[in-house]
């Protein structure tokens, strides 16, 4: 288990035959001033990781970013007595045998223990959500992006989406946040160069047009930089 930054712990599980050989990742958020200890998209924890989590303080909340990332959530809910919540739009996709272990749901625009819920439209599941911590400038994603060892970002194969073009365009909202650390549910997370990696990704996305603006003169008030033109507006 790696501490990415103060109170942000990250652990990885490797599974043979997984997509492109990437790891499945879980995130644990603890720290002073945080209302809850939050475990996100947890793969199974090994004995050492369980001891580490217990030493930090058992999680009180388990957040699942999409229906396909339930993973070891129900098992860890039982072990730690934590509440488990899922995206409201994915609630019907939770397997029936686990439905009784879901304690609640959430929707875009809500806040979970200080984390802003960011709705990601037209993804693999309708409830796919990002979790943004403004204090840490930390974004946590489930299946929305995959990280490669070289620091590049990619999508799941087109076959995973009902409309791949809309799925790509649906990630535009990620450029609306200041992100210093990008934690991914699959593959390599980024602790530096996040903005550059996102811009490199979107430059290869035909559904998204980027425009560089000067301070106070862009589509949004605020600092200079790259902004997204919504092509459907």
Residue ranges and their predicted role:
Residues 19-22, 101-104, 122-125:
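Short solvent-exposed loop/turn micro-motifs enriched in small/polar/acidic residues
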Residues 10, 16-61:
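Pre-active-site segment of Zn-dependent metallo-hydrolases
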Residues 5-12, 113-118:
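Short, hydrophobic/aromatic-rich segments at coil-to-beta transitions
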Residues 215-233:
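C-terminal regulatory/interaction regions
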Residues 15, 35-39, 45, 116, ...:
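Metallo-beta-lactamase
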Residues 2-4, 29, 107-113, 131:
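Short acidic-hydrophobic surface loop/beta-edge motif
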Residues 25, 106, 127-129:
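Residue-level marker for the onset of beta-strands and adjacent loop->beta junctions
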Residues 44-112, 208, 215:
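Active-site HxH/HxHxD metal-binding segment of metal-dependent hydrolases
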């Amino acid at each position: 288990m790696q501490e990415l930054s103060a109170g942000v712990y990250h652990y990885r599980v490797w599974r043979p035959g997984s997509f492109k050989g990437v790891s499945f990742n879980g995130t644990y958020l603890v720290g002073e001033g945080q209302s809850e200890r939050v475990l996100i998209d947890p793969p199974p924890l090994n004995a050492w990781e369980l001891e580490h989590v217990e030493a930090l303080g058992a999680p009180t909340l388990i957040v699942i970013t999409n229906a396909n990332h339930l993973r070891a959530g129900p098992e860890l809910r039982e072990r730690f007595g934590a509440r488990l919540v899922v995206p409201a739009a994915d609630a019907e996709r939770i397997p029936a045998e686990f439905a009784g272990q879901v304690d609640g749901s959430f929707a875009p625009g809500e806040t979970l223990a200080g984390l802003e819920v960011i709705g990601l439209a037209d993804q693999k599941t309708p409830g796919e959500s990002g979790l943004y911590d403004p204090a840490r400038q930390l974004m946590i994603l489930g299946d929305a992006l995959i990280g490669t060892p070289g620091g590049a970002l990619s999508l799941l194969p087109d076959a995973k989406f009902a409309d791949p073009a809309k799925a790509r365009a649906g990630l535009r909202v990620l450029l609306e946040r200041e992100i210093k650390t990008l934690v991914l549910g699959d593959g390599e997370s980024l602790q530096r160069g996040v903005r550059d990696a996102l811009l490199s990704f979107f430059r290869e996305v035909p559904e998204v047009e980027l425009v560089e603006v000067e301070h106070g003169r862009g589509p949004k008030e605020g600092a200079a930089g790259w902004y997204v033109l919504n092509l459907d507006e």
